[in-house]
Amino acid sequence: MEDFFSIGQIINTHGVRGELKIYPLTDDINRFDDLDSVYVDNEIKKVISVKKQPNKLILKLEGIDTLDEAVKYKNKYIKVLREDAVELKEGQYFIKDIIGCNVFDENDKDLGEVYDVISTKNNDVYCIRKEGQQDILVPALKDIVLKIEIENKKIVIKAVEEWLES
């Protein structure tokens, strides 16, 4: 099974020539500039053009040339293969890789599993759930998140009592 990343959602059509209005699901809208092809509904589509608008993009894909054809793709996701994803800087991670990680504090106490990541203007927030306990929201800050081991699906954070008090 291929490993895909959703980078945008088709929210509507644009015009009558098969263009698609895209809501980007990436924090770097410029990543669309270098796309040669994308996957929509498990079909590979060549990118013909990309136009940027405030908070959205207009994408023209090969083989979608009419309004009727474009309508079929409404609410679908634009995806790329992991190998074609933007290369991250050290200390950056894909949300898809963070979700499912087990979280421990520095005393090796099991706090649960990351089930969601909330992206805010200042930083991400990891949503952690452990059965029978209240969910924990952890700001993804360097002084709180001490270690992330994606290959081991493990995150180590500062003891909750230490950072909740400050």
From Swiss-Prot:
Task performed by this protein: An accessory protein needed during the final step in the assembly of 30S ribosomal subunit, possibly for assembly of the head region. Essential for efficient processing of 16S rRNA. May be needed both before and after RbfA during the maturation of 16S rRNA. It has affinity for free ribosomal 30S subunits but not for 70S ribosomes.
Residue ranges of every copy of the PRC barrel domain listed in the record: 90-163
Swiss-Prot/TrEMBL domain comment: The PRC barrel domain binds ribosomal protein uS19.
Pfam hit, one: PRC
Subunit architecture: Binds ribosomal protein uS19.
Organism field: Clostridium acetobutylicum (strain ATCC 824 / DSM 792 / JCM 1419 / IAM 19013 / LMG 5710 / NBRC 13948 / NRRL B-527 / VKM B-1787 / 2291 / W)
Gene Ontology biological process: ribosomal small subunit biogenesis; rRNA processing
Superkingdom: Bacteria
SS bond list: none
Taxonomic path: Bacteria, Bacillati, Bacillota, Clostridia, Eubacteriales
The protein's name: Ribosome maturation factor RimM
